[in-house]
């Protein structure tokens, strides 16, 4: 605290103008360019000073900030984190529960124990009273404000307890009134959902941004053990949520080297996506699997004279699925980061749960090599791979289900706008169906849902920095399991002309990018424009809607606003639905609200 006060004095008395100059010289050219779809400087005022320092020292901006001294980084982080200076985010208090969590609290109602609800990633809650007839009676019961500008991590709910992440803290709240049972502070930022330990039902696992794995006592929040997953490079990140089957905690590995590649001095690219398996009892690392073989030099760039490397990329952005019976893991991968593109990018991969060995890999798009340098004029000719995209990776979790004959199948949606059904044993594509135009931020982005008869697909189709062959088709789509035929579609109307971010300068966009969820005959979907809605699974018609682009009074006293709904999907338990609002990445509308709804 004394150091922060000193820095505030330093900035205000000695170098406010210099701080502004540092930001202008080092940050503004990219973060004030609307065409790059990056978080705006004004939206960064929702970040804390410690979060900004993490980004500059260890995160996505480490390469770009490498020429700055530690003092300059601290000045920039304090200057940008105006909320800590001006008090915009002050006033939070600890609304503590009057008692601790009891074992009965964990078992007396239904749960949503992981990112995809179950290990098949169905995102379908079978134990809820919400249906098409009563969903219109949903009311907002409470809201919780976090200290960041993105509500990125999806909550999970275990009985009467909801677990939600806030920067480097995990909060255990009462799901009916939002009071706090306990709070656990991690060593680094929390980007993803925790997962319930299915063996004892009384502990949870979470993974921070530095690949520190924690096992916590769910009743008390006390640490049981911590473990560290070895990674090849600091640019590897655990973006997607972990999943569990028995003694195996499966942790997906991604990479933000796509951002580092915008620096022509960077030796692009060496990182790879991967999977790690951690023993749920001891925390020991059972195995790790790198998707790509070790990168090899391709020689030096003709202009930069910097060495280039491949293969690289194939990040795992989605929570894997697990077939416990056949001891298999399944997941999708991202694009390659350097040409030549590999055979494992933009692919669905099946892997042995016990050994971590690949069983099969089905690539749906060849030649997709792309990094963020491809979007920056003046730099892209130096750093963009020869194949130049189109960046159509798999961001959404792969779903396992069964066809009419009772045979296991896999269902996958891609940013290209294509949806695929695959044979679970061979990876052979049974059918594919085009539901969206696709794009860097388009097509199917974060997650689908199913009732084991039809597949329900959200489409973003947000246009970004390139021309497209067809008009965008943002909306919801229902596909038949057997042939992939589109049964119905709900097109999302564009209302962005009348909408403006409540914090920062993020832009409104039209589309369903966040994962969707369902229960009974109702589908819940959050939109990039901030609307949260319920739709009939029979025909897609809208049954209920709540506009989250507003200010909220929160149970923890933290001022909160809603914004774009992206990434994390709705969580449904009994008569309750929980949703995050606020996502400033890609130049979208910042926000910091977690909202709790229930039936009257």
Language-model-detected regions and their locations in the chain:
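Sequence/structural segment immediately N-terminal to covalent heme-attachment motifs in c-type
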Residues: 17-33
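Detector for the c-type heme attachment site
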Residues: 28-37, 57, 117, 424
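Extracytoplasmic electron-transfer domains, predominantly the class I c-type cytochrome c fold
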Residues: 29, 38-85
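Blade/loop signatures of beta-propeller domains
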Residues: 96-141, 296
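Repeat-blade elements of multi-bladed beta-propeller folds
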Residues: 109-116, 148-169, 187-213, 234-267, ...
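Short loop/turn segments that connect beta-strands within beta-propeller blades
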Residues: 174-177, 217-220, 279-282, 353-355, ...
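Surface-exposed loop and turn segments in beta-propeller and other repeat-based domains
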Residues: 228-233, 286-310, 358-389, 434-439, ...
């Amino acid at each position: 605290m004394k150091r922060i006060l000193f820095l505030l004095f330093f900035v205000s008395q000695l170098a406010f103008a210099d701080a502004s100059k540092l930001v202008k010289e080092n940050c503004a050219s990219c973060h004030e360019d609307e065409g790059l779809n990056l978080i705006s400087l004004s939206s960064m005022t929702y970040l804390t000073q410690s979060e900004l320092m993490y980004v500059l020292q260890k995160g996505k901006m480490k390469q770009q900030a490498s020429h700055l001294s530690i003092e300059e980084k601290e000045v920039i982080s304090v200057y940008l984190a105006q909320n800590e200076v001006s008090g915009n985010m002050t006033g939070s208090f600890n609304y503590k529960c009057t008692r601790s969590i009891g074992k009965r609290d964990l078992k007396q109602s239904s749960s949503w124990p992981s990112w995809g609800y179950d290990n098949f990633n169905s995102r379908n809650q079978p134990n809820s009273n919400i249906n098409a007839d009563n969903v219109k009676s949903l009311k907002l019961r409470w809201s919780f404000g976090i200290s960041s500008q993105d509500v990125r991590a999806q909550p999970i709910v275990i009985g009467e307890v909801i677990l939600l992440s806030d920067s480097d803290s995990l909060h255990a709240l009462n799901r009916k009134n939002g009071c706090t049972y306990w709070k656990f502070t991690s060593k680094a930022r929390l980007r993803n959902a925790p997962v319930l330990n299915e063996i004892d039902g009384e502990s949870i696992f979470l993974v921070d941004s530095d690949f520190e794995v924690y096992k916590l006592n769910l009743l008390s929040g006390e640490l049981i053990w911590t473990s560290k997953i070895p990674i090849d490079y600091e640019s590897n990140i655990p973006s997607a949520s972990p999943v569990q089957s028995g003694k195996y905690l499966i942790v997906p590995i991604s990479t933000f080297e796509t951002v580092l590649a915008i620096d022509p001095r960077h030796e692009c690219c060496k990182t790879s996506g991967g999977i790690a398996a951690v023993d749920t009892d001891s925390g020991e690392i059972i195995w790790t699997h790198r998707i790509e073989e070790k990168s090899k030099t391709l020689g030096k760039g003709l202009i930069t004279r910097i060495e280039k490397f491949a293969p690289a990329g194939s990040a795992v952005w989605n929570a894997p699925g697990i077939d416990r019976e056949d001891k298999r893991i399944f997941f999708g991968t991202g694009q390659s980061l350097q040409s030549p593109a590999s055979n494992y990018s933009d692919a669905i991969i099946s892997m042995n749960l016990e050994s971590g060995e690949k069983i099969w890999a089905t690539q749906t798009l060849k030649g997709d090599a792309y990094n963020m340098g491809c979007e920056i004029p003046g730099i892209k000719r130096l750093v963009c791979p020869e194949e130049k995209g189109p960046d159509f990776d798999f961001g959404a979790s792969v779903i396992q289900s069964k066809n009419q004959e009772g045979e296991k199948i896999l269902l996958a949606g891609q940013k290209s706008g294509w949806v695929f059904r695959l044979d679970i044993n061979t990876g052979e594509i049974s059918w594919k169906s085009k539901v969206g135009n696709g794009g860097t931020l388009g097509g199917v982005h974060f997650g689908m849902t199913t009732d084991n008869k039809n597949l329900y697909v959200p489409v973003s189709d947000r246009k970004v920095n390139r021309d497209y062959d067809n008009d965008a088709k943002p909306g919801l789509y229902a596909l038949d399991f057997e042939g992939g035929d589109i049964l119905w579609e709900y097109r999302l109307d564009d209302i962005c002309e009348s909408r403006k971010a409540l914090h920062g300068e993020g832009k409104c966009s039209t589309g369903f990018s966040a994962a969707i969820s369902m229960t009974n005959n109702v589908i819940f979907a959050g939109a990039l424009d901030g609307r949260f809605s319920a739709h009939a699974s029979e025909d897609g018609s809208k049954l209920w809607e709540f506009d989250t682009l507003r200010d909220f009074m929160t149970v923890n006293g933290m001022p909160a606003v809603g914004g774009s709904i992206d990434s994390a999907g709705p969580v449904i338990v009994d008569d309750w639905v929980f949703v995050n609002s606020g996502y400033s990445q890609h130049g979208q509308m910042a926000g910091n609200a977690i909202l709790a709804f229930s039936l009257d």
